[in-house]
A protein has these predicted regions:
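Conserved small/polar residues in nucleotide/adenosyl-binding loops
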Residues: 173-175
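Amphipathic alpha-helical segments in well-structured domains
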Residues: 88-95, 109, 113
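Histidine/acidic-rich helix-loop-helix segments that form or flank divalent-metal centers
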Residues: 20-21, 25-28, 50-65, 104-171
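Acidic/His-rich, divalent-metal-binding segments that scaffold phosphate/diphosphate chemistry
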Residues: 1-88, 97, 103
Length: 175
């Protein structure tokens, strides 16, 4: 992983989130440090997916998992913070622009942008909706649409939550 100064030089939009504090009870880290923590979590998962549960291990056993999309969506998931509007919407715009710098297929660029915009969806559904209500599941399925997107969103959500703090991860796995 690039040091923060290298990240800012490589991706100027990253400069806005360097040392940007998050004033809530969940985040232990500044936005840039949280992003780096999320990337570290993904690296840990790749080495030992079984340590993160059966679902994670199953997803990583599939050869079809597009790690390029996963790494870029984690790198960009909070890049819209520090702007006036919703960070997910702003992040999607920035990710769409930045993805043009990488050798990605159009479908990959769209997937990264979608994941950045919707990176909070799974945790929001899990924490704010009744998971025993069939309508909740149908609503979620309608937004996610396919297995690849579900897998990517699930891993992004795990990395995002574990990258917030150990306590956030522990409280979530006990839901």
């Amino acid at each position: 992983i690039l040091p923060k100064s290298g990240m800012k030089a490589f991706i100027p939009d990253f400069g806005r989130i360097v040392a940007l504090m998050q004033f809530n009870m969940y985040h232990w880290f500044t936005v840039d440090e949280h992003t780096i923590q999320c990337l570290k979590v993904l690296s840990e998962i790749e080495k030992l997916p079984k340590n993160y549960g059966t679902a994670v291990e199953e997803i990583f056993s599939r050869k079809s998992l597009n790690r390029k999309i996963l790494y870029l969506s984690i790198l960009f998931h909070d890049i819209g913070k520090g702007l006036e509007n919703d960070h997910s919407i702003e992040g999607e715009k920035i990710a769409t622009k930045l993805c043009k710098r990488f050798t990605l297929q159009d479908s990959e660029r769209k997937k990264v942008s979608w994941l950045v915009r919707n990176h909070l969806m799974m945790s929001d559904f899990a924490q704010k909706r009744d998971l025993s209500d069939q309508k909740t599941i149908i609503d979620f399925q309608g937004q996610v649409q396919d297995r690849e997107t579900l897998d990517l969103l699930f891993i992004l959500t795990v990395c995002d939550i574990k990258g917030v703090s150990s306590d956030a991860w522990l409280s979530l796995i006990h839901i």
